[in-house]
Amino acid sequence: MPKMKTKTAAAKRVRLTATGKVMHAGSGMRHNLEHKSARKRRALKRDDVLQTAQAKKMKGLLG
C-alpha cells in the first residue's frame, strides 16, 4: 500500500504543537485595519487552538 499523502492545503493553514494541539491563525488581519484599535489588532495576531472535533479532522488530513 502506498504512503498516505499530506493534504498540502491543510498543512499551509495549520501547525501542530509538540503536545499535539492544532494551531491556526485567526481571520481579520488582512485589510481594513485602520479602524481597528491597537488592542483589537494585538488580540487578532494571536494563534488559536482548534476545537477538538476540527482538530481530529485536521490531523486526518495531515496524515
Swiss-Prot record:
- What GO cellular component term, any one, is given? ribonucleoprotein complex
Task: Enumerate the InterPro entries for this protein.
Answer: Ribosomal_bL35 (IPR001706), Ribosomal_bL35-like (IPR021137), Ribosomal_bL35_CS (IPR018265), Ribosomal_bL35_sf (IPR037229)
Q: What is this protein's record name?
A: Large ribosomal subunit protein bL35
In residue numbers, the region (Disordered) covers 26-50
Q: Which domain of life is it from?
A: Bacteria
Keyword Manganese in annotation: no
- One Pfam family name from the record? Ribosomal_L35p
What Gene3D superfamilies does the database record attribute to this sequence? 4.10.410.60
Which keywords belong to this entry?
Ribonucleoprotein, Ribosomal protein
> What family, per the record?
Belongs to the bacterial ribosomal protein bL35 family.
Q: Name one GO molecular function term.
A: structural constituent of ribosome
Q: Name one GO biological process term.
A: translation
